[in-house]
Amino acid sequence: MSITCQCPLAEALPKIPNASCPVSFGQIQKVAFQRLRNSTGKANEFTAEAAITKKASWTELLTAQDATKIVVSPYINSPADSGGDARTTSGGNDDLGGVATIIGSEPIQFTGSLRAIDQSIVKAMKELICEANAGNLGVFLFDENGNIEAIQDETTKTTYRPIPIRSFFVADKVHGNYDAKDSNAIQWSYQPNYSDNLAIMKPEDFNPLTDLVNAE
């Protein structure tokens, strides 16, 4: 994504909030997938009335039979994010004084491993590849403490949406043989600036790792 700067610049530098406490998400252990929008283009979201912190709100979406449906992944091992580097001009003689200019940022790529998983689960998850290719797939992240990470609406702070992802992929099985378990690689990409409105929530009456189960 390219950086678009206001021109002319504002009268003063932007206000930067003061840090009051550290904020860090834990190890990503599971995720929930949901379409970003329904067939009419309306965004899928949790609201004050259907709170993201209440199990009942999730149960309704897990059992849904329409575009609001949510599905939960198996446990994901070896979760890792990479990328997000600055995109720059080439520097050298192409730039004044040889100093490169920042023109944007690279996407963040998530990778993980599904270990000892029934391949019927993997087969079903591969259908999500087309959902992501259509630009209509998002995830909610669950850490080892049962916290949830999602996109918070800038105006209505009680509204939360899935994190948009692209380039979703689940690989075929790699046999672990003697020293390891069989595994399937999983990956997707977040678009630049995806985390600008990212928020962490603690559920009130459930643990998403153990209490959210896909409908049969």
Regions found by a protein language model. Give the residues of each.
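Solvent-exposed edge beta-strands and adjacent loop segments
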Residues: 2-111, 163-180
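Polar/charged alpha-helical tracts
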Residues: 11, 60-63, 68, 123, ...
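Short, hydrophobic/proline-enriched secondary-structure or compact coil segments at domain edges
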Residues: 31-37, 110-113, 135-146
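Oligomerization/assembly interface segments of phage tail-like spikes and tubes
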Residues: 97-123, 179-196
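Short acidic, glycine/tyrosine-flanked loop/strand segments centered on an H-E-D-like triad
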Residues: 109-119, 145-172
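General structural signal for secondary-structure boundaries
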Residues: 118, 132-134, 198, 205
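Short, acidic/charged, Gly/Pro-enriched secondary-structure junctions
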Residues: 123-158
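Mixed-charge, glycine-accented linear interaction segment located at domain edges/termini
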Residues: 159-216
